[in-house]
Swiss-Prot record:
Protein name: Formyl-CoA:oxalate CoA-transferase
Organism: Bradyrhizobium sp. (strain ORS 278)
ATP-binding as UniProt keyword: no
Lineage: Bacteria, Pseudomonadati, Pseudomonadota, Alphaproteobacteria, Hyphomicrobiales
Superkingdom as given in the UniProt entry: Bacteria
UniProt-annotated catalytic positions: 168 (nucleophile)
Length: 425
């Protein structure tokens, strides 16, 4: 069975997380992703957060599946020649360098277009054009500047960043969609184009409900927020709302049986209006179904602390899974707080390919995420990440068509290997 992106070749100049997330997704869909790495060094994450000495870290392996690796010194004249040939043979160049790095390498957009007019150049930057476009950005910086941190946490506490990598991985996923869109448009125009995704923009896109609420504030308090029921006035900016639901339906994280010793013995519970009467029956408060203080959503808003306190009395008598089973029978929206250990041990996620076990030649077997997007006609097979420069000669011969003599000549030039240390006299 062919893959969705089979025949698409991607020149991958990305590193760390945002760019590799993008190119890995495209590789899972069948694109031939050629990861260009510095000789002797490679992607910096190969050596970051290592759990096993002298072995590629999980940080690297889990972001670079299904790719091929070529080492190339782009400052070397022969290296520049090889890069020029790669540009001719590839459909997309993806990079997440700092601003201006491609230009300083000697390959600005105009030159790339002259070499290959069909080439799509896709870039991730921290900020879009403006006063901050030259600033260095990492995951937590993106969360802070994109509106996530200011709206995450509790009202009386500090802004918080999330555990999910919405700045890095989130922007990488945005860029992947942009690349596929540009590839489709190219089938009509025959031309390549630039595709850009700024991390600030990506985070803001994921925080759109908070931008929604910012505008709603102009017309009155946000009644579904806990502070409304507590009588706390709103300021002029969207507040941090703890674990309140962002969809307009009141929700909270509640304790379950065992919470005293298990830091994840909790469940998220939403008091959705259509199932309110079922909620009343489950928790043993049938009179609330007709009591004017509780029967209607508007009447419940000032009493959310009391209501969730009563629901929590019930959830504390059940494990999070027992509570979920009972609530699901009545179509009451809820979800257990799952630890990473629980997720890693969930066999159902392995059966769907959401979690995959990968065998690596130097670190052995490890667990990774698989493709979160499932295509019925293009199943994603997750293969291991490449060793540094593992496919260098293969790419030179098979992709660029170089002869053995040419490959040897390129090696002799030093374009593919780390600089040789001079022997001490």
């Amino acid at each position: 069975m062919t893959k969705a992106l089979e025949g698409v070749r991607i020149l991958d100049f990305t590193h760390v997380q945002s760019g590799p997330t993008c190119t890995q997704l495209l590789a899972w869909f069948g694109a031939d992703v050629i990861k260009v790495e510095r000789p002797g060094v490679g992607d910096i994450t190969r050596g970051q957060l290592q759990d096993i000495p002298n072995v590629d870290s999980l940080y690297f392996t889990m972001l670079n599946h299904n790719k091929r690796s070529i080492t190339l010194d782009t400052k070397n004249p022969k290296g520049k020649e090889v890069l020029t040939e790669l540009i001719k043979k590839c459909d997309v160049l993806v990079e997440n360098f700092g601003p201006g790095v491609l230009d300083r390498m000697g390959f600005p957009w105009e030159k790339i277009q002259a070499i290959n007019p069909k080439m799509i150049v896709a870039s991730i930057k921290g900020f879009g054009p403006g006063p901050y476009e030259d600033c260095k950005v990492y995951e937590n910086v993106a969360q802070c500047t994109g509106g996530a941190a200011s709206t995450t946490g509790f009202r009386d506490g500090l802004p918080l960043v999330t555990g999910a990598q919405i700045g890095d991985s989130g922007t990488g996923l945005h860029l992947a969609l942009g690349i596929v869109t540009a590839l489709y448009q190219r089938t009509h125009t025959g031309r390549g184009q630039r595709v850009t995704a700024a991390m600030q923009d990506g985070v803001l896109n994921l925080c759109r409900v908070k931008l929604r609420d910012q505008q709603r504030l102009d017309h009155g308090p946000l009644k579904e927020y806990s502070q409304f029921g507590e009588g706390v006035p709103f300021g002029d900016a969207v507040p941090r709302a703890g674990n309140d639901s962002g969809g307009g339906q009141p929700g909270r994280i509640l304790k379950c049986k065992g919470w005293e010793t298990d830091p994840n013995a909790y469940i998220y519970f939403i008091t959705q209006a259509p199932v309110w009467e079922k909620i009343c029956d489950v928790i043993g408060e049938p009179t609330w179904k007709t009591d004017p203080n509780y029967a209607k959503p508007a009447a419940r808003l000032p009493r959310l602390n009391e209501i969730f306190g009563r629901i929590e009395q019930w959830t504390m008598t059940k494990t999070k899974f027992e509570a979920m089973d009972i609530l699901n029978e009545f179509d009451i929206p809820c979800g257990p707080i799952l630890s990473m250990k629980e997720i890693a041990e969930d066999e159902s996620l392995r059966k769907t390919g959401t979690l995959v076990e990968v065998d690596h030649p130097t670190r052995g077997k490890y667990l990774s995420v698989g493709n979160p997007i499932k295509l019925s006609d293009s199943p994603a097979d997750v293969t291991r990440s490449p060793l540094l420069g593992e496919h260098t000669d293969e790419i030179l011969r098979q992709v660029l068509g170089f002869s053995d003599h040419q490959v040897a000549e390129i090696h002799d030039s030093g374009a593919l290997d780390p600089p040789r240390k001079e022997a001490a006299e």
